[in-house]
Amino acid sequence: MSVLESVDTSNRHQGVGIVGAGLVGCLAALAFAAKGYSVTLFELRPDPKTVDASERNLRSINLAVSNRGIRALKYVDDAMADRILEHIIPMKGRMIHDTTGTKQESQLYGLFGESINSIDRGFLNDCLLAEMRHSDDINVLFNHKLVQLDHLMREDETPTMTFVDTRDNKAEPKTFEFDYIVGADGAHSQFRYQMQRSMRMDFQQKYIDMQYLELYIPPNTLEGATSKFSIDPNHLHIWPRHNFMLIALANKDGSFTSTFFSPWSVIESIKSAQEWVVFFKKNFPDAYKLMGDDHLISVYESNPRGTLMQVTAYPYHNPTGRAIIIGDAAHSMVPFYGQGMNCGFEDVRVLMELIDTNHGNVTKSFKQYSDARKKDLDAICKLALDNYHEMSSKVTSPLYLIRKKLDYTLGKYANGTLFQWLPLYTMISFRDDIPYAKAIAIEKRQATILNRVQIVSLTALALYGAVKAAQCWDRFRR
């Protein structure tokens, strides 16, 4: 038996219930509230203010905020975006660390000095939660576990969501009624599962043969140090080692959040903390010096190994246009293009712009959203998966570097003068006006041109070499 609670919206527009108080759910709540809706946000976890920070950050890959995410923040609240962006650290490119620990190579991201931006996931989530606490139109209920969705199939019915309070095993479930409901509860979405029980939804879940382990580079406290950062804070640091790699992103306090990615077979072949230290010292000698034995041993013994999973689903809305999934609940991707959060925030912006276009008709907007978004979400999920190979292996390949240099040169000096040319990374990270699918289509055409240029160039070099060799041989015979 459950207790029905209908949210009072008598002095407001219609009521919206959102499941998931992560990054995307919080931004969605702020976006709906800004449009005049009464919002209730449900979260399974306890209030972050009551949880020790060290427990929250054990499995939190730092975020790279780029133009798509920033545009979505500014769409919802320009002043809020400015407050958040005060705490970012710009990263102008990748810094590639070699196997000796003595050489580093910068590979710039932007054509004209553009940067992506490092920010701590927990900090950003706290910022969004703090913004919601200033709103009279958003009610946040922590420790609420979704157990059932109902009334999703008939036009004349209003959706309901049933929750249990995880703090009280004896409490009766409570059922809440809303005009519209949104699932933003992550890759393991209970909201999505409940939708699937009552409607036809394509769904695929794929675990990637990859684990991640979080590490930490402390601030530089050496006497006489000129910076609190041990390595350049304005780069995303990568230690590429073909089938495994280490990355590090700067934090405002001078520390770096570092993450080790590898196939499960690699980490499982290491049988002890001491073996882990030896492995780390051999493969990442400069990072080893910054972390030290004690930290590496603690990480091996205490930090959980995270799994990487890709989730796709379609459609994202229910038949009546009253329920929808966004963010990782609809499209969980691997973190290798830095677009997971940016894409989720863009989901919110695209949905809100549809509501604007449809003059506040949320039902029509929910129904249009699936077709409007699918090809872009499919495109970025695939691109994120493909980019692991680039980050872990190709960034050190001479042919790759030549190709990237040519791509960069054409984008910087030829684009807009001789012909249109934009590198893929520029389109994905810095051109929020170009949808993901369109960016990849443009890149495909440009890649064909680059392939032909490379073939012609290599053929010309080979012919030149053959002619020179023939001339040398002719002189030798004389």
From Swiss-Prot:
Pathway: Cofactor biosynthesis; NAD(+) biosynthesis; quinolinate from L-kynurenine: step 1/3. The lineage of its organism: Eukaryota, Fungi, Dikarya, Ascomycota, Saccharomycotina. Its cofactor is FAD. Gene3D superfamilies: FAD/NAD(P)-binding domain (3.50.50.60). One of its GO terms (biological process) is 'de novo' NAD biosynthetic process from L-tryptophan. GO terms for cellular component: mitochondrial outer membrane; peroxisome. SUPFAM superfamilies: FAD/NAD(P)-binding domain. HAMAP family: Kynurenine_monooxygenase. This is Kynurenine 3-monooxygenase. Belongs to the aromatic-ring hydroxylase family. KMO subfamily. It is found in: Mitochondrion outer membrane. Its EC number is 1.14.13.9.
